[in-house]
Amino acid sequence: QLNFVDKLCKLIYPKTIFIKEHPARVGSFEAKKVKELLTQNKNLRIIDPRVNNFEIIKNCQYLVSINSKAGYEAILLGKHVITFGESFYKNSNLIKYCQNLSELKNSHNYLEKKISNQEIIDFFSNIKQQCFKGALYDMSPINVKNFSNSIKQILNND
């Protein structure tokens, strides 16, 4: 991921890039490598991982994500999202999905397009229709049962 950030910084220089470490991965990058990255890229800033995503997203021009729910949150706020990962929302017309950084150069038209409130409502409505009851990482008996029922329903629909 640090290599990705380094290439992204160079690609869109002089625009400033703000990165936030994933809360589940705090401290997983070597401090020395992060310092080198900051030294080599004057347009890079690091945000404290405890800062609320919505506060960051409200102030960004657009969001670039490898694979994070932050992209989903950015759509909620009407922001453009460029994703490089296998997110559940990558095929939406509200998202610019890129397989590699060279495709980022072709994002100008996407970034100029206005996102309407109706498109945002439709996006979340569509996602809600495809979701199942339950919570990620909840191992309670009722949640496990909900998960099991979801799998059965999917298998019965195929």
Regions found by a protein language model. Give the residues of each.
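Short low-complexity, flexible loop/linker segments enriched in glycine and/or proline
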Residues: 33-35, 63, 96-100
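Short, well-ordered loop/turn and helix-capping segments at boundaries between secondary-structure elements
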Residues: 14, 62, 87-90, 110-114
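Leloir-type glycosyltransferase catalytic cores
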Residues: 94-158
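Short, glycine-/Ser/Thr-/acidic-enriched flexible segments
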Residues: 24, 70, 88, 102-103
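A donor-sugar binding/catalytic signature common to diverse glycosyltransferases
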Residues: 48-96
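Catalytic donor nucleotide-activated moiety binding site of glycosyltransferases and closely related
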Residues: 5-49
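Hydrophobic anchor at the start of a short beta-strand
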Residues: 15-17, 81, 114-119
